[in-house]
Amino acid sequence: MSVYGLQRLYIAGAHADATSGKTFDTFDPATGELLARVQQASADDVDRAVASAREGQREWAAMTAMQRSRILRRAVELLRERNDALAELEMRDTGKPIAETRAVDIVTGADVIEYYAGLATAIEGLQVPLRPESFVYTRREPLGVCAGIGAWNYPIQIACWKSAPALAAGNAMIFKPSEVTPLSALKLAEIYTEAGVPAGVFNVVQGDGSVGALLSAHPGIAKVSFTGGVETGKKVMSLAGASSLKEVTMELGGKSPLIVFDDADLDRAADIAVTANFFSAGQVCTNGTRVFVQQAVKDAFVERVLARVARIRAGKPSDPDTNFGPLASAAQLDKVLGYIDSGKAEGAKLLAGGARLVNDHFASGQYVAPTVFGDCRDDMRIVREEIFGPVMSILSFETEDEAIARANATDYGLAAGVVTENLSRAHRAIHRLEAGICWINTWGESPAEMPVGGYKQSGVGRENGITTLEHYTRIKSVQVELGRYQPVF
């Protein structure tokens, strides 16, 4: 028997049975316990979700921006009231420590909805004078029905990040969470309905990549926002373009560089590096997994990093003292262990970790020890490829130009950071780094006000910040003639 029982779809403001006859299971990654059996959507279910979204979107868009704003603010209140219960659900589904899910996942999701609720009334057009008797004005209008496809590392946060700007702009959204962590999106749907969002404006369809493909190719959907891996993102983008030239937002993978210069506060640098590699057991797309350290301070830096890694408290996610949990799935566990084996085989020096944790309460979970490799080279797989697990690669460099060139020598461009006390060098280096999200003397915070997205193959478009509303609206230009029309014939 499962903990949460049978989970269905959420369509037209209510839970709904799927018609596929298929289900999949979701497990607690810390214990292996069956959490729920989840119904998988069929093509007919996706059609049903699109039809209800169209109907709901017309009602939603007809409301005033202030009305939409008030409803979204009510959803924020409900999320915050239920923070602890939602955090426990997220802990069970993702394996994250309860201290993390209580402080981060629902909190940051609610913050983003609150942010866009405030911006809903600020969506406006322009007036452009042409001549005394003629002018142009523009309207920003909603796209219609949008699709959101989420990743398994931040399920409810991603659902909030994608739905908030969409709904604030007057759109509807059909959201597909990852089949690895499918539970919390259904709770968000219930909250939206309770807050007053019309039926159909936020639907949830469950399933694997085949359901994501149905959404990406559906002619009734105007936009797809996807978070996940690069190769899957390319497939989504191809389907979206080939079917109906949908607009897309892609937040994809990364292999982000963290550059520690020789004048850095090394205690600060070590704190940043450990956070940038081991928060959420390393399952964060922006993690700074390529740590470039100037040669003169490398040994002192490594010493500080290893001291901090030794203090990491791996344990049961429900223990409030735990700050390091399991990986989200057995498949991810196998992938990470494969990369660790590759690092060893290619000659990287194992400084910490490097194995699965199997003693005592770790035995039934998908735990990997926080792993640090030194003496890494740019051509190693652990340096070139996204691992999405708790594996830090330390590389040394001599000059600023060398560090920048090597940091940019990747197809990724999601995030980057520098640690230095030299203000001029900090900004100079950041301006040369090819990444969409950058940090100076810090790492990892992505507040609602900050546009998030990548360069190169790390993404298209942005999430969060004011500019994201541009990706959920379209511009209509209207010319008005006050004078006499001048005929051509």
Swiss-Prot record:
Residues reported in the UniProt entry to bind K(+) 2: L245, K456, G459
Record text on subunit structure and interactions: Dimer of dimers.
Entry-linked CDD domains: ALDH_F9_TMBADH (cd07090)
Gene designation per UniProt: betB
Protein name as annotated: Betaine aldehyde dehydrogenase
EC number in record: 1.2.1.8
InterPro entries: Ald_DH/histidinol_DH, Ald_DH_C, Ald_DH_CS_CYS, Ald_DH_CS_GLU, Ald_DH_N, Aldehyde_DH_dom, BADH
Ligand binding (NAD(+)): G150, A151, W152, K176, P177, S178, E179, G229, V230, E231, T232, G253, C285, E386
Keyword Cell wall biogenesis/degradation among record annotations: no
Binding site for K(+) 1: T26, D93, V180
Metabolic or biological pathway: Amine and polyamine biosynthesis; betaine biosynthesis via choline pathway; betaine from betaine aldehyde: step 1/1
